[in-house]
A protein has these predicted regions:
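Short cysteine-rich loop/turn motifs with clustered Cys
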Residues: 2-32, 54
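Residues immediately within or flanking Cys/His clusters that coordinate Zn2+
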Residues: 15, 46-49
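Short, solvent-exposed loop/turn segments at secondary-structure junctions
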Residues: 34-36
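Polybasic, low-complexity binding patches
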Residues: 38-47, 57-100
Length: 100
């Protein structure tokens, strides 16, 4: 399980806004259906996606997260995978610039 507070901050500020409505004020929602996890544990931070408070709460209320995302026509797992890859490239570039 990846824990990365810097990545969670990146998810909140990267400019895409809520994946459902586009609002800029977002929480980092951990996708529960992205990987197998132990009871009561969050998935790794690499599975965090931006959701406004309203949609974050609504997603948790449904209990059927995969269905909730499908209802909104969003492939949140693909988004999380791509965003985490972009973040990795971004942080690698920052580290290289610091070394120069």
């Amino acid at each position: 399980r990846i824990k990365d507070k810097k990545y969670l901050a990146y998810v909140k500020r990267n400019g895409s806004g809520c994946l459902v409505c586009g609002r800029k004020e977002v929480d980092a929602h951990h996708l529960r259906h992205a990987q197998h996890r132990g009871w009561g544990l969050k998935n790794g931070d690499q599975w965090a996606v931006p959701l406004c408070r309203e949609h974050h709460t609504d997603c948790h209320r449904t209990g059927k997260e995969a269905r909730w995302w499908a209802m909104h026509g969003i492939d949140a797992i693909a988004w999380a995978e791509m965003n985490y890859m972009v973040y990795g490239e971004y942080t690698s570039q920052e580290e290289n610039e610091e070394d120069e």
